[in-house]
From Swiss-Prot:
Entries under CDD domains matching the protein: homeodomain (cd00086)
GO biological process per UniProt: adenohypophysis development; negative regulation of cell population proliferation; negative regulation of transcription by RNA polymerase II; positive regulation of transcription by RNA polymerase II; regulation of DNA-templated transcription; regulation of transcription by RNA polymerase II
Role played: Transcription factor involved in the specification of the lactotrope, somatotrope, and thyrotrope phenotypes in the developing anterior pituitary. Specifically binds to the consensus sequence 5'-TAAAT-3'. Activates growth hormone and prolactin genes.
Descriptive protein name: Pituitary-specific positive transcription factor 1
A GO molecular-function descriptor: RNA polymerase II cis-regulatory region sequence-specific DNA binding
InterPro entries: HD, Homeobox_CS, Homeodomain-like_sf, Lambda_DNA-bd_dom_sf, POU, POU_dom, POU_domain_TF
Gene Ontology CC entries for this record: chromatin; cytosol; nucleoplasm; nucleus
Organism: Homo sapiens
Pfam families documented for this protein: Homeodomain, Pou
Disease cited in the entry: Pituitary hormone deficiency, combined, 1: Combined pituitary hormone deficiency is defined as the impaired production of growth hormone and one or more of the other five anterior pituitary hormones. CPHD1 is characterized by pleiotropic deficiencies of growth hormone, prolactin and thyroid-stimulating hormone, while the production of adrenocorticotropic hormone, luteinizing hormone, and follicle-stimulating hormone are preserved.
Domain of life: Eukaryota
Domain POU-specific: 124-198
Keyword vocabulary terms for this entry: Activator, Disease variant, DNA-binding, Dwarfism, Homeobox, Nucleus, Transcription, Transcription regulation
Effect of T75A: Increases the interaction with LHX3. No effect on the interaction with ELK1
Gene name for this UniProt entry: POU1F1
Length: 291
């Protein structure tokens, strides 16, 4: 079947010599009524009935580019409106708007699935709960042993992990007042902090112990040794190094102990003399005032 060009508003004549099966076409509605287009397109279409021009190849079947309605049937229209008559008509619809994005659909489905999930209740006798209780008690004991308060721990963690840690957080953890999920997260953080705190404490104790070892213990001198040293002091209050060594060997004492004893004895003798002189001066002054 070939295309037809219209010579009037109501009938079409075949372009070729094939005269078999002329299809009369009755336009019950004007072209302007077939499609809701703009005024400009309506004017163009209203004047198109009096024009004679060739039309591109016809579209049959279910081709989406055919327009118009056949009288009493669903046979497609035998002509196509020029493209310029539809320039102000409906804009083309993009394919993404016609079909939903599968990624977005999957996301919505996943969101609905997660919203339906209900957290299973925690068994209070489970090994996880017992381990958490044991760690909370051990943490409290070790924290107190190291000399840290809950405030100290909260401030130390806040300086590293943020302001969500405070004394209240540590208190609630030790009293098992946090949710199981938050308590498990805090357990890992507190465990690491406790290890570091104990390492620092061990280094501090080692340093203090070294300083204490440097300080010598106080030596106790027997009464007989003190009497012998007093006799030597009466003879010579500033003995030489050889004399100090000889006295240390005789009294079975260390040389440094004997040297320090003589130094202390001279200081005490000096204080006694100073105090005695001050007393004598006061007595003399009072005696003169009485006269």
């Amino acid at each position: 079947m070939s295309c037809q060009a219209f010579t009037s508003a109501d009938t079409f004549i075949p372009l070729n010599s094939d005269a078999s099966a002329t299809l009369p076409l009755i336009m019950h509605h004007s072209a302007a009524e077939c499609l809701p287009v703009s005024n400009h397109a309506t004017n163009v279409m209203s004047t198109a009935t009096g024009l004679h021009y060739s039309v591109p190849s016809c579209h049959y079947g279910n081709q989406p580019s055919t327009y118009g309605v056949m009288a009493g049937s669903l046979t497609p229209c035998l002509y196509k409106f020029p493209d310029h008559t539809l320039s102000h008509g409906f804009p083309p619809i993009h394919q993404p708007l016609l079909a939903e994005d599968p990624t977005a659909a999957d996301f919505k489905q996943e969101l609905r699935r997660k919203s339906k999930l209900v957290e299973e209740p925690i068994d209070m006798d489970s090994p996880e709960i017992r381990e958490l209780e044991k760690f909370a008690n051990e943490f409290k004991v070790r924290r107190i042993k190291l000399g840290y308060t809950q405030t100290n721990v909260g401030e130390a963690l806040a300086a590293v992990h943020g302001s969500e840690f405070s004394q209240t957080t540590i208190c609630r953890f030790e009293n098992l007042q946090l949710s199981f999920k938050n308590a498990c997260k805090l357990k890992a953080i507190l465990s690491k902090w406790l290890e570091e705190a104990e390492q620092v404490g061990a280094l501090y104790n080692e340093k203090v112990g070294a300083n204490e070892r440097k300080r010598k213990r106080r030596t106790t001198i027997s009464i007989a040794a003190k009497d012998a040293l007093e006799r030597h002091f009466g003879e010579q209050n500033k003995p030489s190094s050889q004399e100090i060594m000889r006295m240390a060997e005789e009294l079975n004492l260390e040389k440094e102990v004997v040297r320090v004893w003589f130094c202390n004895r001279r200081q005490r003798e000096k204080r006694v003399k100073t105090s005695l002189n001050q007393s004598l001066f006061s007595i003399s002054k009072e005696h003169l005032e009485c006269r």
